[in-house]
Amino acid sequence: MKKILIPVSIVAILLCASWKEDAKTVSPDRLFLADSGKSLFVTNRAGNELIKMSSDGQKAEQKVTLSSPVNAMTQDPSGNLWVVCDGNTGMMYELDGKKLSVQSKTKSGATPSDILYSPVSKSLWVTQRFNNELWEIDPATRKVKTKIAIGREPVAMAPFAGDSCLLIANNLPEMPSTAYPIAVQLDIVDVPSKKVTGRIMLPNGATDAKSVAVDKNQTYAYVTHLIARYQLPTNQLDRGWMATNTLSIIDLKARKLLTSVLLDTPQKGAANPWSVIVTPDDKQIIVAAAGSQELVRIDRIALHERLAKAKQGEMVTPSVKSWNNIPNDAGFLYGIRDFIPTQGKGPRSVVATGDKIYTANYYTSELVSMDLNGKNLKKQVLGAPLAFTKVGKGDMYFH
């Protein structure tokens, strides 16, 4: 017993030493960039706050307290920030981009999960998770112009086709659990016509989609999710027998699934893939793996070169059997992917500027920065860790 308690005590002391005794709990849930990547914002889910950090990410410059936790943020051409907040009666806030003062506050559906400003329609688009809808909102009047029925629990979206279309990631499959195939579907919404013009089904078993990112040229989209092996007997858990952590690649020109690659290796899992981004130079894909406390960094150029060769039947790695087997191949990313520990618990969000990657440890209250090679890691403690509360500890054990 002593051998177990001593290391745990040391960890607790080290965590305690990094924040003041009277510090309030801060659980950094999401990160956003504004002002063309010059401004970094972090959310505090425990305190319903939106915090603007200094340019080096080392201190909080401004903050605003809202009605409930922030789920998403976008910026309009005037520089104002539009923020949607969690809850059965969600709220949409308009904030002054410089002062963070509240300009307006509007009720906005059941759990608005993502928001973006469209330069094509000059309006705001909001995914309503538990309404299973996409809303178009006039920023001048803040009134709903259009409601579009989409898939089950939409959680994230990204523009493509010159911003004239939206690719929407739905969290859960719509079909019953006895169906085959059973998988999450993505919706394609045409902005000018305000209609769903296509649907893309992810591989059988795809569930818990969390995030979608698009490259600068809007050629490919990347979606994080799990693949659950519903049709297999539950007689083992290792090597992805029951579930795997996955990145699906969407060909936006063809508007169809290209393939899916496993973030796991045969020896370790990249548990709970949360946020995904493409770095501004289009050279890397970064995934925040919240359950394994690390970032998964993929060489995007090498990935697409490998996929092109595999499509032609080349054996690009020793484990590749065929193109159709790639979604089951835990060795496909060998040599073009690495794992970067975030030195904390629960990294859920990730953003990147021209020279830095930022993530945030949700349970241990740290903003983490590093260079684009995953080196020179720095941590800034934001407050008391959520992991030190009963609710936070239970939540951490569950996730």
Each model region followed by its residue ranges:
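Residue position within the beta-strands of beta-propeller blades
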Residues: V42, V83-V84, V126, I168-A169, ...
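Short, conserved, GDST-rich strand-edge loop motifs in beta-rich repeat architectures
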Residues: A169-A183, V223-T244, R297-Q312
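Short, solvent-exposed loop/turn segments at conserved positions within beta-propeller repeat blades
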Residues: R45-A46, D86-N88, R129-F130, P176-A183, ...
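Surface-exposed loop and turn segments in beta-propeller and other repeat-based domains
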Residues: V196-A206, A254-A271, A308-P341, L382-M396
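Beta-strand-rich domains and repeat architectures in extracellular enzymes and scaffolds
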Residues: E21-E49, N71-A72
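A short beta-strand motif characteristic of beta-propeller blades
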Residues: W19-A23, K59-V64, S101-T106, K143-I148, ...
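Residue-level detector of Asp-centered blade-edge/turn motifs that repeat once per structural unit
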Residues: D35-G37, Q75-G79, S118-S121, A161-D163, ...
